[in-house]
Amino acid sequence: MAYKIADSCVSCGACASECPVNAISQGDSIFVIDADTCIDCGNCANVCPVGAPVQE
């Protein structure tokens, strides 16, 4: 089960730098996670200051 980034994302980029498989990239207004690449490690959720990454 992959993570997704909720609308509460503040685009700080903390999650992207912690992703070991580079599944997170900047979208139009918030960061997005490629579900096919995500390995469900939870690093993004652990570092996000607003709790935007959530499991799908």
From Swiss-Prot:
SUPFAM superfamilies, sorted: 4Fe-4S ferredoxins
Cofactor: binding comment: Binds 2 [4Fe-4S] clusters.
Matching InterPro entries: 4Fe4S_Fe-S-bd, 4Fe4S_Fe_S_CS, 7Fe_ferredoxin, PSI_iron-sulfur_center
Domain 4Fe-4S ferredoxin-type: 2-28, 29-56
Example of a GO MF term: metal ion binding
Cellular component terms (Gene Ontology): cytoplasm
Cofactor(s) essential for the protein: [4Fe-4S] cluster
Binding site for [4Fe-4S] cluster 1: C9, C12, C15, C48
Residues bound to [4Fe-4S] cluster 2: C19, C38, C41, C44
Gene3D superfamilies documented for this protein: 3.30.70.20
Pfam families referenced in this protein's UniProt entry, alphabetically: Fer4_7 (PF12838)
Keywords: 4Fe-4S, Electron transport, Iron, Iron-sulfur, Metal-binding, Repeat, Transport
Function: Ferredoxins are iron-sulfur proteins that transfer electrons in a wide variety of metabolic reactions.
PANTHER family in UniProt: PHOTOSYSTEM I IRON-SULFUR CENTER (PTHR24960:SF79), PHOTOSYSTEM I IRON-SULFUR CENTER-RELATED (PTHR24960)
Full protein name: Ferredoxin
